[in-house]
């Protein structure tokens, strides 16, 4: 009798734990295409943890970097033609994407908290 009661309590506890456990939201993947000296802005609705891939379809190299609202800079290093660079968004707030080589290239978007 005691064993059955303990088993019921354990079963109910386990069921409650499994149903109340929330899985983290899956991260989204975005792709931004570089055409010569222009970034195709796909209208990002990004959040912290999402990934962005920058695909260089230009015939020239680029060197993109992201500047977060708090001043933190993340550089993606030199990106030769027909290559892809990927980054995961680390902070919420306003982000500006620019190219060290071609300062005319610019894209802005906001990153929401998780």
UniProtKB/Swiss-Prot annotation:
Coiled coil: none annotated. Probably involved in TTQ prosthetic group biosynthesis. This is Methylamine utilization protein MauL. Disulfide bonds: none annotated. Pathway: One-carbon metabolism; methylamine degradation.
């Amino acid at each position: 009798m005691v064993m059955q009661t303990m088993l019921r309590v354990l079963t109910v506890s386990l069921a409650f734990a499994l149903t109340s456990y929330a899985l983290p939201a899956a991260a989204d993947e975005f792709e931004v295409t570089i055409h010569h000296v222009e970034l195709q802005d796909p209208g990002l609705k990004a959040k912290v943890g999402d990934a962005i891939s920058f695909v260089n379809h230009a015939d020239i190299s680029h060197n993109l970097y992201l500047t977060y609202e708090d001043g933190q800079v993340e550089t993606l290093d030199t990106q030769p033609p027909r290559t892809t660079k990927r980054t995961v968004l680390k902070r919420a707030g306003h982000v500006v994407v620019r190219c060290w080589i071609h300062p005319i290239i610019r894209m802005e978007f906001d990153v929401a908290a998780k």
